[in-house]
Amino acid sequence: MNRFLTLLFIFFAICTDISAQEAEMEQHLFDTMRDGDKAAVVAIHIGAEDADAKQNIEKFNAMLRKAYPTIDFREAWTSRILIQQVHSNGGGNIPTTDELFSQLNKDGYTHLLIQSSNIVNSTDMQILRYEVDAAKETFKQIRLGEPLLTDETDYEEVLKATAAAYGSEKEANVLMCEGTHGSENAQYALLDYILKVQDYKSWFVATSGGYPSLSSLVKQLKKQKVKKVHLIPFLFTAGSKATSAIAHEWAQQLQRAGYKVTTELHNLSDVDAIIDIFENHLRHAEMFHRYSPKELKMMTR
């Protein structure tokens, strides 16, 4: 297993480095603007199911507004279910990504700088990449920042910030991550591996419905003869309702396994250093033009 994780780390680090760095050139987004051009900074979220989740989203949005105070700000959600919930409750109309792009085009915008609140390179993030690539025919420049966990430095900085904010010295700290599918699991396995490489003693990663799983977590806890567990939501836009539901389910299973459980009430959105990493990714997207698959294909001819 150790050999497998080592190879996984190397493979993921290499793939990330190639996709995020080598296939790009330095070209400041706003330097490409000409008379008559219009720019917007765009925040993309899955959505919010309660007031707390909306506050978490607003912290992210406030970061974008502060970082680019003279640029128009826009927001879109990717979950139609959450959009409909807000609309049904009288919260107004929030556009999907496609709807927002269409409206921005009608309003004469030519340059878009986009950052999502995705933690990992999830299916939702992959769909957003596809939508951005499709919109490149519509706008003069459209740039997309990377998710929170992109290269190995991100992993290390996120773990350092999370440990400083929520770590417990008297209990085993468990990062509660959202369930993933297929190859997405590798990103949380990598997170768990870096915890061990960086010598974060008594720190663990588990996902709801993915890997590392709760059952694999319990095996690790037994090996280290852990008695107390501190659950830490490794979430960003989730509100108290969703976080509490996940934590309650996990706590029950761990208690049945014989552990005393405490739960952190906050998540990653309350950590300033985490917000800063998102901003750094957006700044990078502003400064560098990333080649599309079509552009890369043309370059190899």
Task: List where the protein language model places each region.
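Sec-dependent N-terminal signal peptides
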Residues: 4-14
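Sec/Tat signal peptide C-region and signal peptidase I cleavage site
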Residues: 16-20
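Active-site-proximal alpha-helix that buttresses catalytic centers in soluble enzyme cores
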Residues: 21-301
